[in-house]
Structures are given as C-alpha cells and as structure tokens.
Amino acid sequence: AAPSQTTLYQSYPNPFNPEVWIPYELAKDSPISIDIYTPAGERVRTLDIGMKPTGRYIDKDFAAYWDGRTATGERVASGIYFYVFRTVDYVGSGKMVIVK
C-alpha cells in the first residue's frame, strides 16, 4: 500500500564520511529538493531530486544521496549539517554529522 503521509527519516549512516543517504516516504507524486546547511545557515548544496512518484524511498538504491561535497565539488568540513526536505505540500528537516 502507498504511504498515507509524507515522512522524512533520519539520514544514515550518522555520523557519515564521506557519503550519506536521506530516506523518505511520499504520500503523493511530487518534485523533491533537499537543501543542506551549516549550523550558521550557509547553504552548501541543493539536491534537486526531481519528480518522484508516491512510494517509499528508504534503502540506498532509492533514498536521496549526498556525496558530502559542496555545489562546487569541494568536500565539506567535519561537523554538523542540517538538511531541509521539500515537496509540494511538506517540509521536513534533520541533522547529520560528518566525521573525517
């Protein structure tokens, strides 16, 4: 059965180095984007996931993926990062830690 509500889950592994997956469930078809921020509020990357159909995106083959790099391709520093997940009718956020 399709998910009854859109849900964002904790990224894994957490802490991570250098890559991380962000699992979620979608209650309806939607374009998805994920912005990744430093604790100071600086956006380091936007993941434009694109249009996704209703479903569960939990394991590594389906969850959103971040390679731990900035928009310009540089590896981010160790520390805490926040992710903001957006669909047409849902916004969720989470915290993840990169340890090198």
What is each stretch, according to the model?
Residues 23, 74-100:
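C-terminal tail/sorting-segment detector
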Residues 1-12, 16-40, 46-49:
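Glycine-centered coil/turn sites that cap beta-strands in beta-rich domains
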Residues 36-40, 70, 98-100:
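Residue-level signal for short segments within beta-strands and strand-turn junctions
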Residues 28-31, 43-76, 87-92:
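Glycine-centered tight-turn motifs at strand-turn-strand junctions
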Residues 12, 16, 24, 37, ...:
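Aromatic side chains
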Residues 9, 21-23, 33, 63-65, ...:
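Beta-strand secondary-structure signal
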